[in-house]
């Protein structure tokens, strides 16, 4: 009896101490109108722990035009002669991204998806062209939930 209990206890400790933690992300995407060109940032605020909190922070940021949470800057001065629009999407993910810093090097291509359960997926692709090929290979319903975008953040292991 004691052996069985010890074995069960040993197996319990052999399991990972904790499943990967789901983080709440704000995926902010600037899409250049009339094209497939987009830039995305993956923003995480440790004190926002649910999707409703994320959506409220987006409403407040858009209303006040002062992002107290998920602080970011849309550099419209870099897009003179072009029009674009911002899309904000709150999502959950076990992925971890490096911190976003405003900078010129949006040179990492990602296939990004947010499914009907608001789960974020992001897959690094070698190029924007290869990302578009992967996007076109998805089912129509998956295509509607996905996009290709450039980012200056890395996925961290």
Feature names for model-found ranges:
Residues 14-17:
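N-terminal signal peptide c-region/cleavage motif recognized by signal peptidases
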Residues 1-6:
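Bacterial N-terminal signal peptides that target proteins for export
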Residues 20-157:
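Mitochondrial intermembrane space
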């Amino acid at each position: 009896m004691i052996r069985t209990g010890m074995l069960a206890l040993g197996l319990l400790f052999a399991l990972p101490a904790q499943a990967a933690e789901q983080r709440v992300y704000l995926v902010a995407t600037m899409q250049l109108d009339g094209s497939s060109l987009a830039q995305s940032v993956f923003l995480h605020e440790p004190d926002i722990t649910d999707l409703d909190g994320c959506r409220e922070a987006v409403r407040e940021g858009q209303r006040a035009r002062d992002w107290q949470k998920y602080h970011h800057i849309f550099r419209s001065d870099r897009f003179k002669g072009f029009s674009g629009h911002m899309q904000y999407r709150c999502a959950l993910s076990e992925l971890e991204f490096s911190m976003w810093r405003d900078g010129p090097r949006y040179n990492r291509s990602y296939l990004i998806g947010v499914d009907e359960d608001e789960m974020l997926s992001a897959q690094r692709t070698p190029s924007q062209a290869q990302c578009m090929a992967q996007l076109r290979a998805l089912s129509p319903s998956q295509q509607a939930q996905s996009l290709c975008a450039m980012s200056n953040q890395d996925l961290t292991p």
